[in-house]
């Protein structure tokens, strides 16, 4: 059954979100129209503002409305000589939530994937290389995901960074706190044994 053209357009637009199929999009549209039009208008306004005003930090490439994100603009953090390389802005939020890292970030906005046409240019590696060449970076922490693509990306960046004589480290991978060994996959378990620490 077809609805009004505007309702059909709303449902189709909601389907662009990850994990939202036709039924979920339809439920969302009905919820906004039937029960919460005020929230729908607020959502539309926030979405419109974000789409027109949010861009990328000129230093680290995370999302911001300004030229520099708050971390890069911070006198203390922005002048740190340690850069943590991550794949997405969501990774920055996850690390920041832990509260243990006090350096700068560099957001790749993806990972190397030649089959998908994603190479060094798409990841902004020329900008990262300029940061390394400036002489202001003493350590590069590679925090890409522990996937085949993430590992390949980390190795590519490590090779690039070695030319600039900076310390290169990789975040540890292993058994999660509170996890049970019987549920951990064999690759993670192998990484845990290889990366074990003395007590």
Curated annotation (Swiss-Prot):
Organism domain of life: Bacteria
Intrachain S-S bonds: none
Keyword Isomerase: no
Keywords for the protein's UniProt record, in alphabetical order: DNA damage, DNA recombination, DNA repair, Metal-binding, Zinc, Zinc-finger
GO biological process: DNA recombination; DNA repair
Coiled-coil region(s): none
UniProt cross-references to Gene3D superfamilies, sorted A to Z: 3.40.1360.10, 6.10.250.240, RecR Domain 1 (1.10.8.420)
Domain annotation Toprim: ranges: 81-176
SUPFAM superfamilies tied to this protein: Recombination protein RecR
Zinc finger C4-type: from-to: 57-72
Gene Ontology molecular function terms on file: DNA binding; zinc ion binding
Pfam families associated with the record: RecR_C (PF21175), RecR_HhH (PF21176), RecR_ZnF (PF02132), Toprim_4 (PF13662)
SMART domains the record matches: TOPRIM (SM00493)
Record NCBIfam families: recR
Function recorded in the entry: May play a role in DNA repair. It seems to be involved in an RecBC-independent recombinational process of DNA repair. It may act with RecF and RecO.
Family: Belongs to the RecR family.
Protein name: Recombination protein RecR
Native organism: Shewanella sp. (strain W3-18-1)
């Amino acid at each position: 059954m077809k609805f009004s053209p505007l309702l059909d357009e709303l449902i189709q637009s909601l389907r662009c979100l990850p994990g939202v199929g036709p039924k979920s999009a339809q439920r969302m549209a009905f919820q906004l129209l039937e029960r919460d039009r005020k929230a729908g208008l607020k959502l539309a306004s926030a979405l419109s503002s974000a789409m027109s005003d949010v861009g990328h930090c000129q230093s680290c490439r995370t999302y911001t409305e300004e030229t520099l994100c708050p971390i890069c603009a911070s006198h203390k953090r922005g002048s740190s000589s340690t850069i943590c390389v991550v794949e997405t802005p969501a990774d920055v939020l996850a690390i920041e939530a832990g509260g243990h890292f006090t350096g700068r970030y560099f957001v790749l906005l993806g990972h190397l994937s030649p089959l998908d046409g994603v190479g060094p240019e798409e990841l902004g590696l020329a900008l990262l290389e300029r940061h390394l060449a400036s002489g202001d970076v003493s350590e590069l922490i590679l925090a890409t995901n522990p996937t085949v693509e993430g590992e390949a990306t980390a190795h590519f960046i490590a090779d690039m960074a070695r030319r600039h004589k900076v310390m290169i480290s990789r975040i540890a991978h292993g058994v999660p706190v509170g996890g049970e060994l019987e549920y951990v996959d064999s690759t993670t378990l192998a990484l845990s044994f290889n990366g074990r620490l003395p007590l």
